[in-house]
From Swiss-Prot:
Organism encoding this protein: Nitrosomonas eutropha (strain DSM 101675 / C91 / Nm57)
Enzyme class, spelled out: translocase
Name this polypeptide is given: Protein translocase subunit SecA
Top-level taxon of origin: Bacteria
NCBIfam families documented for this protein: PRK12904.1 (NF009538), secA (TIGR00963)
Organism ancestry: Bacteria, Pseudomonadati, Pseudomonadota, Betaproteobacteria, Nitrosomonadales
Quaternary structure (record): Monomer and homodimer. Part of the essential Sec protein translocation apparatus which comprises SecA, SecYEG and auxiliary proteins SecDF-YajC and YidC.
């Protein structure tokens, strides 16, 4: 209450920031009179002037008003588009490394040109991150005209692009690309054998488009580069045949072999299920007689069985994946796009392939991985823009340290968001949806229908076809046409059905997309300039008539066929209507059979329907119901936030280790004078460690095992050092002197190798051996960390803190890996006999991984730990240092719900 009162008196922080930016906007507007009279050449020369001022010590903030005014003028001349004042505010928000929430259709793409130009002046590079190649290419070509007009270079990074082109794109002042490609290029740069093969520069400044989709929705799935591992794919087929013979439990207490927990996406075998599974596996010869699934030799069978159960019980065709060209292709659950080349990990993808009876590919070995959270936090400055960020402002602040600023709209929003209608069954719901679509079509109002899956998309399409209602279908199977379909979705009588609208990146303009049609006329070589001008004029007039007609009909009507588990995704769908003050409307149709309601709220809403004696086909429409659904969404959002936070806490451990390894790699690649000193230090450390095993520090001669030391030096490093003879010849030879003499002998032996082949070749060979050893041990270490992480949540049952145990054991594994690398390098270099330079090149060849695959892995350990915590099995928590002010129980919840903390996220504490 007090905070609301203070906000009413002094305004919110967001209001204060907008006022602060508005003062700078006035300065920029005043500069327009100075900049407008400049010729094109004079305007272009401003770029050189700004660069000179930066080199003289002037800060970017000091240049901002003038630079923004220059970009605005260039945009007017090149694109015929002038930045609104609210876009100038958004540009300042991005420049300061914050997130700008700007409603759909308000011009985020144009807004971004302001901070992009300003920050590109430093010469360190600016990365613009989009959700797909189409948008990266489109924006680079479209907005690139402004930058090129002002004398800056523009590059675009696309998947499957030649290496030289990619290096050139990253070398440009401004680079467009997808989040996946930036992340994979970073990982690939840390797998190269020569520094010249790297493509990326220093990570300076990134602006992330659809920042909520990339930094939140995809934060649970790390980027992974993997290679094929050895293994028998036939086992998946043999296990798949058995899965239908196992029965699913209807509930916890009913008979059956396994249960499915949809909330945690887990499949668990019951005791009877284990016995039945053992019997079935024995029948097909996979489990030897008199042995158990619990035997160490049969652990892989449990892995195969669990993957098969998950494939059958949790993953559905045309919802989670599609089958194309004898392959299982994953469907992105957030955007509805196909993700060819991506594969689920832990054998799940192979299990789905066996289920669908397509060719089974071998399992993968992880070569390198990173989460988007840790990749984007490496940028010196990070900013983002989206139409829906405010509901996730707390997470952006907690995880990335990014403040969210809501940018005022250029015109007031005129869209009418109607209350949800809830039906008992999906059949009744779809009947109501068809009736609403039919009503809109008959009066000419355009409709956009958002569905949650390809399956529902095609079901609705079939129903509309039966009703003889013409419509367009947009889903992951036709993403090549998606921009054209969406661009024309605002025309009269247009009915468009689309899967999840996140990241589509194309505005829906009432009356159809005028600019798209005009651009086609402009690039038509068959027309002369006069004809083009006339045709463009006619097109504008015809569009204006269509535009006014659609506005009279009420604008674009949005229909949601189900609520997503995130309110933000629902808001993205709604936000497609009512752009720049246009009229519009939206409504969600729900049923008690929808996943969200079935899992979280069906009993409560069903009781309301029963009390009201609702007849079949009648919908319930009440603020209480809408509030109950939003509460269910908040529960899921809070749970997903906890999962992402836990995943980050685990990945931070691996990230610290990754930084050390990658830094060592880069130092090796960049060492111009060779790495002889490093190799010498490693050799001394390894030999001293070996000596210590046989001649302990500060020990007397009677405790020494000299024969053992001589044997170890000979077998490990092929060194024949007469230690016993030295001791017999010199009675004054003590431990320290002996160590020095052994090391001197070792170094002399190694120096002989160097002289034999030449210092240059030996330096090259040392570098290759070090890189190969680091890479191979790092791959093994990643697998060990993965294995450790999968079972670490079970430590909670032993009254241990899983996170603390993971950190401790991961550190021990890492220390062991570093020792193994040193020993490996020393042994190879001491024992190898180099006869030609070709041998050096062969090492470089073998150290380069082949047949790489790029994908997101389905990490589930954070969810498993979360489950064990909620079931009351968490160990006693360790003390921690709070990084921010404690939130009072009666304070407003930081998630933005408007409720007290104790009644919202505080319930989770």
């Amino acid at each position: 209450m007090l905070s609301n009162l203070l906000k009413g008196i002094f305004g919110s922080r967001n209001d204060r920031l907008v006022k602060q930016y508005s003062r700078i906007v006035r300065t920029i507007n005043e500069l327009e009179a100075v900049i407008s009279p400049l010729s094109d050449e004079e305007l272009r020369d401003k770029t050189s002037e700004f660069k000179q001022r930066i080199s003289n010590g002037e800060k970017l903030d000091q240049l901002l008003p003038e630079a923004f005014a220059v970009v605005r003028e260039a945009s007017k001349r090149v694109l015929g588009m002038r930045h609104f004042d609210v876009q100038l505010i958004g540009g300042m928000v991005l420049h300061e490394g914050k997130i700008a929430e700007m409603r759909t259709g308000e011009g985020k793409t144009l807004m971004a040109t302001l901070p992009i130009y300003l920050n590109a002046l430093s010469g360190k590079g600016v990365h613009i991150v989009t959700v797909n190649d189409y948008l990266a290419k489109r924006d680079a070509e479209w907005m690139g005209q402004i930058y090129q007009f002002l004398g800056l270079s523009v590059g675009v990074v696309l998947s499957q692009m030649p290496h030289e082109d990619k290096q050139a794109a990253y070398g440009a002042d401004i680079t467009y690309g997808t989040n996946n490609e930036y992340g994979f290029d970073y990982l690939r740069d840390n797998m190269v054998g020569h520094s010249a093969e790297r493509v990326q520069r220093v990570l300076n400044f990134a602006i992330v488009d659809e920042v909520d989709s990339i930094l939140i929705d995809e934060a649970r799935t790390p980027l992974i580069i993997s290679g094929m591992a050895e293994g028998d794919t036939e086992v998946y087929k043999r296990v798949d045949v058995l899965i239908p013979r196992l029965t699913r439990q209807k509930d916890e207490n009913s008979p059956g072999d396994y249960s499915v927990d949809e909330k945690t996406q887990q499949v668990l075998l019951s005791e009877e299920g284990f016995i039945h599974a053992e019997k079935l596996l024995g029948e097909v010869g996979l489990l030897p007689a008199e042995s158990s699934l619990y035997d160490p030799a049969n652990i892989t069978l449990i892995h195969h069985l669990n993957a098969g159960l998950r494939a059958h019980a949790l993953y559905n065709r045309d919802q989670h994946y599609v089958v194309q060209n004898d392959e299982v292709v994953i469907v992105d659950e957030f955007t509805g796009r196909l993700m060819p080349g991506r594969r689920w990990s832990e054998g799940l993808h192979q299990a789905v392939e066996a289920k669908e009876n397509v060719s089974i590919q071998k399992e993968n070995q992880t070569l390198a991985s990173i989460t988007f959270q840790n990749y984007f936090r490496m940028y010196e400055k990070l900013a983002g823009m989206t139409g829906t960020a405010d509901t996730e402002a707390f997470e952006f602040q907690q995880i990335y340290g990014l403040e969210t600023v809501v940018i005022p709209t250029h015109r007031p929003i005129a869209r009418e968001d109607r209350m949800d209608q809830v039906f008992r069954t999906a059949r009744e719901k779809y009947q109501a949806i068809i009736a609403d679509i039919k009503s809109c079509y008959e009066r000419g109002q355009p409709v956009l229908v958002g569905t949650g899956s390809i399956e529902n998309n095609e079901l609705l399409s079939t129903m509309l076809t039966k009703e003889k209602l013409p419509h367009q279908v947009l889903n992951a199977k036709q993403h090549e046409r998606e921009a054209d379909i969406i661009a024309q979705a605002g025309q009269s009588k247009m009915v468009t059905i689309a899967t999840n609208m996140a990241g589509r990146g194309t505005d829906i303009v009432l009356g159809g997309n005028l600019e798209q049609v005009i651009n086609r006329i402009r690039v038509d070589d068959a027309l002369d300039d006069m004809t083009k001008t006339e045709k463009i004029k006619e097109t504008r007039q015809a569009w204006q008539v269509r535009h006014d007609e659609v506005i009279k009909l009420g604008g674009l009507h949005i229909i949601g066929t189900e609520r997503h588990e995130s309110r933000r995704i629902d808001n993205q769908l709604r936000g497609r209507s009512g752009r720049q003050g246009d009229p519009g409307s939206s409504r969600f149709y729900l049923s008690l059979e929808d996943p969200l309601l079935r899992i979280f709220s069906s009993d409560r809403v069903a009781n309301i329907m029963t009390r009201l004696k609702m007849p079949e086909g009648e919908a319930i429409e009440h603020p209480w119901v809408t509030r109950a659904i939003e509460n269910a969404q908040r529960k899921v959002e809070a749970r997903n936030f906890d999962i992402r936070k836990q995943l980050l806490e685990y990945d931070d451990v691996a990230n610290d280790q990754r930084k050390v390894i990658y830094q060592q790699r880069n130092e090796l690649l960049d060492a111009e004078q060779g790495i002889s000193e490093t190799v010498s230090a490693i050799r001394e450390s390894v030999i001293n460690q070996l000596i210590g095993l046989y001649i302990p520090a500060q020990s007397i001669e009677e405790q020494w095992d000299v024969p053992g030391l001589e044997k170890a030096l000979a077998s490990e490093f092929l060194l024949r050092i007469p230690v016993q003879e030295w001791l017999e010849a010199d009675s004054e030879l003590h431990e320290e002197n002996l160590r020095s003499r052994i090391m001197e002998s070792v170094n002399t032996s190694y120096q002989g190798k160097v002289e034999q082949v030449g210092a240059s070749i030996m330096n090259q060979y040392e570098r290759m051996v070090m890189l190969h050893s680091i890479d191979s041990h790092w791959r093994e270490h990643l697998a060990a960390l993965d294995h450790l992480r999968q079972g670490i949540h079970l430590r909670g049952y032993a009254q241990q803190n899983p996170k603390q145990e993971y950190k401790r054991e991961a550190f021990e594994l890492f220390a062991g890996m570093l020792d193994a690398i040193k020993a490996d390098v020393t042994k190879i270099l001491m024992t190898v006999q180099i006869r030609s330079e070709q041998q050096v090149e062969s090492v470089a060849e073998t150290s380069t991984p082949k047949n790489l695959q790029y994908h997101h892995a389905a990490y589930s350990e954070a969810e498993e730990e979360h489950q064990s915590v909620t079931e009351g099995h968490e160990a006693k928590q360790q003390p921690f240092v709070r990084k921010s002010d404690k939130i009072g129980r009666n304070d407003p919840c930081p998630c933005g719900s408007g409720r007290k903390y104790k009644q919202c996220h505080g319930k989770l504490d």
